[in-house]
Regions:
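Sequence-structural signature of mature extracellular/luminal beta-sheet repeat domains
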Residues: 20-327
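Bacterial Sec-dependent N-terminal signal peptides
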Residues: 1-21
Length: 327
């Protein structure tokens, strides 16, 4: 397909709606929320037409937001200037590993050197993009095995300042999840990886570890557990590279009874406030775990990300990309 025809196809399939459509509402439960989100803020739809949008990541060198459509095995770039363009295809299923679903990348992150690192569902690995390019992407495997066994389907990730990678590995990228015949590990782990020391299993107590983030002082690790029977955000102290003092930071089991959705992606604001997708939309929690409010797009929301200056929070909500202005 020629580039002109491809551009036309993308334009016709994915409608960019910047400034033309809003949806949902913002629920305010505490005055602290007014310090983060303007009272007149709305949820602005930027693009729609996806199957399951995920993994939003602001990339300064591109001055835009990368995100994935997991079932489409594709990653997109959205910028204020150009709108939406296809960025990576394939994004996460290249035939690298035995797989039961043709799913692409999920979580995205930049390492301390600015390289793009992807949790690749279909390839069952965490990989690095070799070159920043639109066509024919090439990936380098960082980690795909633990104890001689294939990982399940790495889901979300974050780096500390030293370049250590922390990631979660639930079985969501496998067709039958825990019952999938290709699943080799008997648990869903939280791992640390580095070039110097390789992979280390940090914790395997959570049934569905999903979104993961570090506090700004890198002393605490937050992990969302996307299990309908145990809908919690767990917190751990990070001590000498290990996770200790596991505790419940926020318990949503009661909230889950009346709201749709489970914990998925989460990000930590420079103020220490946590923005986490979960029951009802995007929950905003202060550093003590108090629920300040919820951004309610009216759709299942997978993940969220700030831009470089924290002027906007971007949401991947089911079939749409949206954003909300911050203070």
């Amino acid at each position: 397909m020629s580039k002109s025809l491809l551009s036309l196809f993308v334009f016709m399939t994915f409608l960019t709606l910047k400034g033309q459509e809003t949806l949902g509402e913002i629920e305010r439960l505490d005055p602290q929320l007014d310090l983060l989100i303007p009272k007149n803020a709305s949820i602005e739809v930027l693009a729609k037409g996806f199957v399951w949008a995920e993994g939003p990541l602001w990339v300064p060198r591109l001055n835009g937001l990368l995100f994935t459509d997991v079932p489409k095995n594709t990653a997109y770039l959205w910028t204020d200037k150009e709108g939406l363009v296809e960025f990576l295809n394939p994004s996460g299923m290249t035939g690298h590993a035995p797989h039961s679903e043709n799913e692409g990348a999920n979580g995205l992150a930049l390492d301390p050197k600015g390289n793009l690192v992807l949790c690749q569902h279909g390839d069952r690995r965490v990989a690095r993009l070799k070159k920043w390019q639109f066509d024919k992407p090439e990936y380098e495997t960082l980690v795909d095995h633990y104890d001689g066994k294939w990982l399940n389907s790495p889901n979300d990730l974050t780096f500390n300042k030293n370049g250590d990678l922390f990631f979660t590995d639930p079985p969501y990228g496998m067709k039958r999840q825990d019952e999938d015949s290709l699943k080799e590990l008997s648990f869903s782990g939280i791992y640390k990886w580095s070039f110097s020391s390789g992979i280390t299993l940090l914790n395997k107590s959570l049934s569905r570890p999903n979104g993961i983030a570090l506090s700004k002082d890198e002393k605490t690790v937050y992990v969302g557990n996307s299990d309908i029977k145990n809908a919690i955000i767990a917190a751990f102290d990070l001590v000498d590279g290990n996770l200790v003092n596991q505790r419940i930071f926020f318990d949503a089991k009661t909230l889950k009874r009346k709201e749709r959705g489970l914990f998925d992606g989460l990000k930590v604001h420079s103020s220490g406030v946590i923005f986490t997708t979960g029951p009802g939309g995007v929950l905003i929690l202060n550093a003590e775990g108090k629920h300040l409010g919820t951004i309610r797009p009216g759709k299942a929301t997978a993940n969220c990300a700030f831009d470089a200056d924290e002027k906007y929070l971007y949401l991947t909500s089911s079939d749409i990309l949206a954003r909300i202005k911050l203070k």
